[in-house]
Design a protein with these regions (language model features):
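Nucleotide-activated donor-binding/catalytic signature segment of Leloir-type glycosyltransferases, i.e.
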Residues: 234, 238-260
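Short hydrophobic beta-strand element within catalytic cores of glycosyltransferases
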Residues: 294-297, 307
Length: 369
């Protein structure tokens, strides 16, 4: 019987882990400190940058505690924290039983599609392999509890934002940013900084849980009443790009090797729209608030936790283009200085230095005792 690609990769992972385990048994390999390993994929995107942010802040207060790696096969006798439940699913059968494993579960429910339904079933059936589960939002925390994840095994640790890096621009910084990205001076610049296409290619097939169709529809409606320019970042944005082109909405798409360079894009914005149907965060909610950018977000992920509707930003029901547009029109027409001032105060409570200590205190400390 032929072995499929997924099965072959699984066998390779088993072989890698078994090899390191055998070397450890023979006394030829002991692994390396520190005691906690935060595992990410190699892709230069959100999960990797989340890991760097958590780990950097923890190491600043608790040196020698945790490191970032994309090589779980070499981990023996460690606390192993997978930053994505999907990545853990690929390695769960192969990992050394000497490890204590934690998984961050950001988002996903069976209704999101057959593949996600299979993933959820596998995750719940293999809880015995885990020492803990982390999630970022109250929404997903409630969901996991409803599915039977034990309260004692679950911790809610919000995503964070570097409030010293993401700050409101002064007038000169704003002018420089808009000139750099080709934003005309007389337009209203709307931002969308995410990955919303399937895979890592052009992204012409939409990842619908990220709401790219909702974003395009909302922007097209706003463009009837305002001179709109869209600034996009992130990989796999082809679906959104084609949609904007079809509606004649001008845009610029940029991608950064260093994610932190995205701060200059926030400096160019008049509005940020987060139109997802399902989210774990996203970080853009806090980054917008920290950067003084007015925000309209759908009621999903951490947006429900950090947005006080009509106070520091606006919330809209998932899939409700009409409400998204109405809230955006209000911010663009009436001004948003009070919103952005309150949003900045909100973001400061989620600085990485604060949320990383939650991760250390509620998850790592007990496992390291």
């Amino acid at each position: 019987m032929a072995v499929g690609g997924a099965e072959l990769k699984g066998l390779v992972r088993l072989g890698w882990c078994a090899g390191y385990g055998a070397l450890n048994t023979l006394g030829l390999y002991r692994g390396s400190a520190p005691p906690v390993a935060y595992v990410t994929e190699k892709a230069n995107w959100s999960i990797q940058w989340d890991a760097r942010s958590y780990v950097g802040a923890i190491e600043a207060r608790h040196p020698g505690t945790v490191t970032v790696t994309h090589r779980p096969q070499s981990l023996i006798g460690r606390v192993v924290h997978f930053g994505s439940q999907f990545h853990w699913g690929q390695w769960s059968r192969a990992l050394s039983a000497s490890n204590r494993t934690i998984v961050t579960y950001y988002h996903g429910k069976p209704a999101d599609g057959p593949e996600m339904a299979r993933h959820v079933d596998y995750f719940l059936a293999n809880m015995k392999r885990l020492s803990g589960v982390v999630t970022a939002s109250r929404m997903v925390e409630r969901r996991l509890l409803d599915w039977g994840v034990p309260r004692a095994q679950l911790a809610r640790v919000p995503l964070g934002v570097d409030t010293t890096h993401f700050r409101p621009p002064n007038a000169d910084q704003r002018l420089v940013a808009r000139a750099k990205w080709g934003v005309p001076p007389d337009v209203l610049c709307i931002g969308s900084f995410q990955k919303d296409g399937v895979g890592w290619g052009p992204g012409l097939e939409p990842k619908l849980i990220k709401g790219p169709d909702v974003f395009v529809a909302a922007v097209a409606r706003l463009a009837r009443d305002f001179p709109v320019f869209v600034l996009l970042t992130g990989p796999a944005r082809g679906y959104v790009i084609k949609g904007l082109e079809s509606h004649g909405v001008p845009f610029r798409h940029v991608f950064f090797d260093d994610y932190r360079d995205i701060v200059g894009c926030y400096h160019a914005l008049d509005l940020y729209l987060m139109t997802s149907r399902e989210e774990g965060g996203p970080k853009a909610v806090l980054e917008s608030m920290a950067s003084g950018v007015p925000l309209v977000a759908t009621r999903t992920g951490m947006a429900e936790d950090v947005v006080e509707d009509g106070v520091n930003a606006y919330l809209a029901p998932v899939d409700n283009v009409e409400t998204i547009v109405a809230r955006a029109q209000s911010l663009l027409s009436d001004g948003a200085s009070d919103f952005t001032t309150r949003g900045r105060i909100t973001a400061e409570a989620y600085d990485w230095s604060i949320v990383s200590e939650v991760l250390y205190d509620t998850v790592y400390r007990e496992l390291l005792a």
